[in-house]
Amino acid sequence: MLLIPAIDLKDGQCVRLKQGDMDQATIFSEDPAAMARKWVDLGARRLHLVDLNGAFAGKPKNLEAIEAILEEVGDEIPVQLGGGIRSLETIEKYLDAGLSYVIIGTAAVKNPGFLQDACTAFSGSIIVGLDAKDGKVATDGWSKLTGHEVIDLARKFEDYGVESIVYTDIGRDGMLQGINIDATVKLAQAVGIPVIASGGLSNLTDIENLCEVEEHGVEGVICGRAIYSGDLDFAAAQKRADELNGELDDA
């Protein structure tokens, strides 16, 4: 089970939002690269970056911070990024800069042809981000709820060749209410590609519950507010996940 720390970028700083509201941002660090180093030193095997300004603007807005993070840890672990990715040129620029994966969200839902082109051009590097509330997909920084069923879209995108799916239950994100395990498993069982859970992770119990369903295709979990607020000790949680998955050697 991959525990993936999230570094949400707003105006070059590492912040957390409450339910996607840009006006409800808590600044956790003015040095995102130092934050990235901290999580890697604590045992992170992948990082999840979000360009919040980019998500709302529809184009990259935190390039300097992203490049600083990649310079700091990009040679050590894979780094994925979402937010504002609306063109093949942007994807190419990010992958050339050292990102391992880019996450396409709103653009995938609104313009499936773009996602298809991206999967063809950058095979193995495209993750799709599906944000849903009550099984229905939301777009545009969660401001618009669509009529699309999340499972239908996930299956379609799997056919296009996406690497994996980051699934966010937007009713719970940033609220520390616990991961929506049932909805995550339901999605993972419906597709043959890995699903990464997101939204609402609150404590070690969530991690233990996710490890129990890993066999259904739940590959990892995005760790957001809980590891910043202290509700979850990241290093201890990754260690516990490894124990549960029998990945610890007898050493």
Swiss-Prot record:
It is found in: Cytoplasm. InterPro entries: Aldolase_TIM, His_biosynth, HisA_bact_arch, Isoase_HisA-like, Isoase_HisA-like_bact, RibuloseP-bd_barrel. Pfam families: His_biosynth (PF00977). One of its GO terms (molecular function) is 1-(5-phosphoribosyl)-5-[(5-phosphoribosylamino)methylideneamino]imidazole-4-carboxamide isomerase activity. GO terms for biological process: L-histidine biosynthetic process; L-tryptophan biosynthetic process. Belongs to the HisA/HisF family. This is 1-(5-phosphoribosyl)-5-[(5-phosphoribosylamino)methylideneamino] imidazole-4-carboxamide isomerase. It comes from Burkholderia vietnamiensis (strain G4 / LMG 22486) (Burkholderia cepacia (strain R1808)).
